[in-house]
Amino acid sequence: MALVTVSRSPPASGHSTPVGPTQDRVVRRRGRLQRRQSFAVLRGAVLGLQDGGDSNVASEADSEPMEEPSGEEQPTEDQTDKGQGLQSPWKQVQKRHLHLMVELLRPQDDIRLAAQLEAARPPRLRYLLVVSTGEELSEEAILLGVDFPDSSSHSCTLGLVLPLWSDTQVYLDGDGGFSVTSGGQSRIFKPVSIQTMWATLQVLHQACEVALGSGLVPGGSALAWATYYQEKLNSDQGCLNEWMAMSDLESFRPPNAEPGQASEQEKMEQAILAELWQVLDTSDLDSVTSKEIRQALELRLGCPLQQYRDFIDNQMLLLMAQQDRASRIFPHLYLGSEWNAANLEELQKNRVSHILNMAREIDNFFPERFTYYNVRVWDEESAQLLPHWKETHRFIEDARAQGTRVLVHCKMGVSRSAATVLAYAMKQYGWDLEQALIHVQELRPIVRPNHGFLRQLRTYQGILTASRQSHVWEQKVGVVSPEEPLAPEVSTPLPPLPPEPGGSGEVMVMGLEGSQETPKEELGLRPRINLRGVMRSISLLEPSESESTPEAGGLPEVFSSDEEPLHPFSQLSRAKGGQRVRKGPWPALKSRQSVVALHSAALVASRTRAFQEQGQGQEQSEPGMSSTPRLRKVMRQASVDDSREEDKA
């Protein structure tokens, strides 16, 4: 492990040094900006260390802010501990990358951790940064993703910005990877080693606990500084796609080939795919076999295709599934499956410009061609779709306003996407749930939202009804609601759409309660491992301190009777402005039972101590009385109880 110190100074200014009352504020500001940050460099990770007062040294020479003491190196250069001997190549590379990543930050922000991640396309390098700000004693943190074209590159780009809100959860995904979910966004990361993973999870756990204790929620002034980095996103589309990748996808878009670097295998697969359409169109699918399809392709291409048998079978199934076209529910809205979302020709033919992906396990196949909106949920009754329906309605309306069309899809186009289309119809056209379900099932008979989604649709129907009634009442009294009106924009029913070619002419209308059971789209997943639970289990393995019965006067301050109720952040104190400041190291989490027991013991001891003091005070004021302190304490408690009974009576 090596120690690296980076000197960070703001740009030189031509203004003179202020004098008078404002000088102290300027010096303090320079002390925050002109400082050095030290890092512990590990293989694959860089840990930020706490400043040990370097800011005071930097703020002393306020008349010459850019001047460095003799014997020290210039700003933005590093100083290693003992500074002797040749360093290994990986340390030199990490130090150079560290300098480049520091240059991406604002002067008041610090890197708490820089962890190297696995890259899907070497020689690219990826780093995950945990960045905190020094503004006003704030403990807010964000995650940044940094991309390097290769290890020798002298520049880097920003590909990810993820604020850490109070709802942040970290899950272990196996094989050294983990996912971070915050503010409705989920991102996956896979460090290059176990040591790097362990260092990263420790820093993430601390940042998540601070965010939870500070109550950081979207929509307020918290983490407003993250917009600075969101405006600086400049990685190429390939890097952005890698940061957006999901760990549990079952359907992937094909890899983006580098310009001019398509392999011979990819060229052959493209040729097979082009001919496969023609072969299937001219074959009797009820009698033809896979071997006969391959032999027909060999005749067309003039070469053996033994090594492409699995590719041909896979593409053949894909093409057959894509023959089930998406259902046109409204003139501007199609409802379909993942096969429809992967069929570029059909999407272009239907003039689709927006794709609403309601599946957790399906990737965005053409992010460079279409506008996507993702709602990452599973087809489970416990999944919550209702909070997303306002944004999905707005997304669909954006496509309609542009004169284009939107495809709403999930895995099979049966449950998640169908429920979202039903919610859209109820809000847009003022229909109730039964009317919307009849219309959608007429055009796509396989629609079957699960029971949990049906309950949410009924709740949504009540919300829309109440909103419309409230809107009408406000119009009667002449009050304009500041909220977005939920009244339908179009109240007239749509003309019936012609049935899709090749579709069934039967109308299958199912009741809400009597819908037939259909096979689930996905099997249930086993519970995910949460980082907070892992850290709690680790803390319980630590040897506990010797617990002896404390005396009344020797109780620790954390268990004082006048303190607020205990919470997991007992070492976070309130600073100016109501913000929390962390003091000292993070304590190990104790079991809830022991904390409750100790708190109860402390409360009893403190009350006993208070009774003793009151008893001693009365004994001094009434020296003629000969009762003992113990007897006096019992009598006082009895009198208090009697007075309470009299009050109740």
From Swiss-Prot:
Instruction: Write the lineage as a comma-separated list.
Output: Eukaryota, Metazoa, Chordata, Craniata, Vertebrata
Task: Provide the alphabetized UniProt keywords.
Answer: Acetylation, Cytoplasm, Cytoskeleton, Hydrolase, Nucleus, Phosphoprotein, Protein phosphatase
- Catalyzes what? O-phospho-L-tyrosyl-[protein] + H2O = L-tyrosyl-[protein] + phosphate; O-phospho-L-seryl-[protein] + H2O = L-seryl-[protein] + phosphate; O-phospho-L-threonyl-[protein] + H2O = L-threonyl-[protein] + phosphate
- Pfam families, sorted: DEK_C, DSPc, PH_SSH1-like_1st
Gene3D superfamilies reported for this sequence: Protein tyrosine phosphatase superfamily
Q: What class of enzyme is it?
A: hydrolase
The record's section on PROSITE patterns has: DEK_C, TYR_PHOSPHATASE_1, TYR_PHOSPHATASE_2, TYR_PHOSPHATASE_DUAL
Q: List the molecular function annotations (GO) for this entry.
A: actin binding; protein serine/threonine phosphatase activity; protein tyrosine phosphatase activity
Q: Which residues form the Tyrosine-protein phosphatase domain?
A: 325-466
Asked if the keyword Signal belongs to this entry, the reply reads: no
Report, as the record phrases it, the tissue specificity of this protein: Expressed in brain, small intestine and testis. Also expressed at lower levels in heart, kidney, liver, spleen and thymus.
Q: Specify the protein name.
A: Protein phosphatase Slingshot homolog 3
**Gene from which the chain derives:** Ssh3
Active site, renumbered: C410 (phosphocysteine intermediate)
Identify residues that carry Phosphoserine.
Answer: S9, S38, S88
Q: Name one GO cellular component term.
A: cytoskeleton
Which stretches does UniProt call biased (Basic and acidic residues)? 639-649
Q: What does this protein do?
A: Protein phosphatase which may play a role in the regulation of actin filament dynamics. Can dephosphorylate and activate the actin binding/depolymerizing factor cofilin, which subsequently binds to actin filaments and stimulates their disassembly.
* Coiled coil segments of this chain: none
- Segments for region (Disordered): 1-32, 49-90, 541-586, 608-649
